[in-house]
């Protein structure tokens, strides 16, 4: 059994770590609330433009944008959103597993895979795995802006325009609630038609485009892609802070349990030392 002094040192070390994890839990909780506000502020725009795009995809347009055209999927692209920092449980690895499973499905069909990566954790993971990475960006901080994402998104859109990609997917963590974050894969291109049967059945009209459909749709479809990627980034950020808060709370609770266990061991060691000293005193007195 370790000595009382050694155990006391361990208890002090665990208490110091517990203070750090408690502080990180409180910081993550504060950042999560701000991230949730940003996510909820941008979500109505992202959802509305997605509905508009759903109508456009179902419409009989006089101008057919290339993003609306289905083609054989020989080259598939993914925009993968991860965190820049760790200590957030299995958030990133669960996302990577889902992405890899989907990629493997396409590879079995003979498709080539190309990635654009947002976040240092995904950058390190996929670069080390030998994946073909066309663009990467990290260090977006706690308040990412659309301007920070345009470069990586633009690379993938240019490849799609040139026919170097036939499908484009967005991979991110969807914020369900504080305890649940779900990895999700959304199809960006070609434009997914609405999943709503009611919309498809009732959609018997078209928009009136002013001045011309081509420039309007070109701008609208670009905004759609940018808004979906940005929404994925802010949702992933809210997931990161929620996962970190939960992980740090678990670490703090585990530290409390460990301190209790060490305190019990310390008390036993101290009791054994006192018993030994008393035995030595009694033995010495008897010898006299």
UniProtKB/Swiss-Prot annotation:
Q: Which domain of life is it from?
A: Bacteria
Keywords from UniProt, A to Z, are:
ATP synthesis, Cell inner membrane, Cell membrane, CF(1), Hydrogen ion transport, Ion transport, Membrane, Transport
For this protein, the record's InterPro entries field holds:
ATP_synth_F1_ATPase_gsu (IPR035968), ATP_synth_F1_gsu (IPR000131), ATP_synth_F1_gsu_CS (IPR023632)
Q: Which GO terms describe its cellular component?
A: plasma membrane; proton-transporting ATP synthase complex
Instruction: Give the membrane topology.
Output: Peripheral membrane protein
What processes does the entry annotate via GO biological process terms? proton motive force-driven ATP synthesis; proton motive force-driven plasma membrane ATP synthesis
Q: Which GO terms describe its molecular function?
A: ATP binding; proton-transporting ATP synthase activity, rotational mechanism
Where this protein primarily resides, as one coarse class?
membrane
Q: Where in the cell is it found?
A: Cell inner membrane
**Role, per record:** Produces ATP from ADP in the presence of a proton gradient across the membrane. The gamma chain is believed to be important in regulating ATPase activity and the flow of protons through the CF(0) complex.
Q: How does it assemble?
A: F-type ATPases have 2 components, CF(1) - the catalytic core - and CF(0) - the membrane proton channel. CF(1) has five subunits: alpha(3), beta(3), gamma(1), delta(1), epsilon(1). CF(0) has three main subunits: a, b and c.
Q: State the similarity comment.
A: Belongs to the ATPase gamma chain family.
Q: PANTHER family, alphabetically?
A: ATP SYNTHASE GAMMA CHAIN, ATP SYNTHASE SUBUNIT GAMMA, MITOCHONDRIAL
In its UniProt entry, what is this protein called? ATP synthase gamma chain
**Chain's gene name:** atpG
